[in-house]
Amino acid sequence: SHWFNAVEAEVYAISLFFTAMVFYLIVRWADEADNPASDRLLLIIAYIIGLAIGAHLLNILAIPAIALVIYFRKKEFSWSTFFALMAITVVGFFVIYPGIVKWLPATLKISAIFPLVIFLAVLLGIYYAVKAHQRVASLALISVFLIILGYSTYGVIFIRSTLNPPIDENNPDTIERFLFYLNREQYGDVGLFPRRWNNDPKYSSEWDFFWRYQVDHMYNRYFLWQFVGQDGDYQGARVDISKFYALPLLLGLFGLAHHVSKDRRRALVVFTLFLMTGYAVIVYLNQNDPQPRERDYAYTGSFYAFALWIGIGAQGLLAYASRWFKGKNNLPRVALVLALLFVAIPMNMFAKNYRMHSRAGNFVAWDYSR
């Protein structure tokens, strides 16, 4: 799925790049949190989140994981502080979405300068917070400012549409059409319930549809494609264990167990990222059957999170190997284990995936463009 996203003219590759960036930066912040200058990393994260939602909303699903890193780095665990964290995270989430994403542009209906008034009010709040040496308040307000600044890239859509280019989907060249475009109203509104959107008799109940189609077919299958194997490049492709022999999956599960045994808190952070960018998306989207195309591209954030456990699993195996091969000549043996891991997993995945993803000789896009 990562490979597919990388060669498709879509938003999902850059969206995952921003997700990976904010996750890397929050880990860097955790290492430097005792240094007051580390606040700059939090501000960079806020700006990247703003840029990211200018591409796709998936990036905001990393916010709970970011909040957990900050919490575990600054607080000792207690249920009271943990629930306080959850409340703050929910408030912060709603400030961004729907607050900045939907409500701020909607103020254009009141007046074209109303968003500018809000923007200036945030700047004024920053000035007084900094002047009063309110570190947390100033950090929060500057973060809001940077998120708005990053999100302002959406203005390019409005400017471009007013020039009436040949491709101008939804024609967002007026305030009404622009808000229609921002709110994705062309896709309709699907609620979380009921889950059953198909009366096919093969589904016995709403729960059966949710599990068999939405979870198993529309997520578990994609997840196993990445780490077990895919039997072909066609709609509805099944899982094929003969591709990767499930070695990446097993190494990732070992990495998860190793991570939990060594650092439960950071394991919970990665699990939160995995859950929010995977199964939580499934619950939110409430997809109907059938879908016009495969949707694996939307869940690459969770595949990225699991890949972290594959890396941790490889490190854990090397650590165990160094203990098993104690003595003066242990380095060549550990190097052999590393080489075997490299050949058995990434090299094998490259070899088995290359033909399916190679565009050599594929002129379909060119032919259609003519």
Language-model segments: which ranges?
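Signature aromatic-anchored transmembrane alpha helix within multi-pass, membrane-resident enzymes
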Residues: V260-R264, I312-F350
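Short acidic/glycine- and proline-prone juxtamembrane loop motifs at membrane-interface regions
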Residues: F4-Y12, A55
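Lumenal/periplasmic acceptor-binding loop at the mouth of the active site in multi-pass
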Residues: S161-H258, F274
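Transmembrane-embedded, aromatic-rich helix segments that form part
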Residues: F17-F18, L43, L58-Y71, I113-V122, ...
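Hydrophobic, aromatic-rich transmembrane alpha-helices
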Residues: V122-V130, F244-R264, G316
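Membrane-interface alpha helices of multi-pass inner-membrane proteins
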Residues: L41-A55, T89-V91
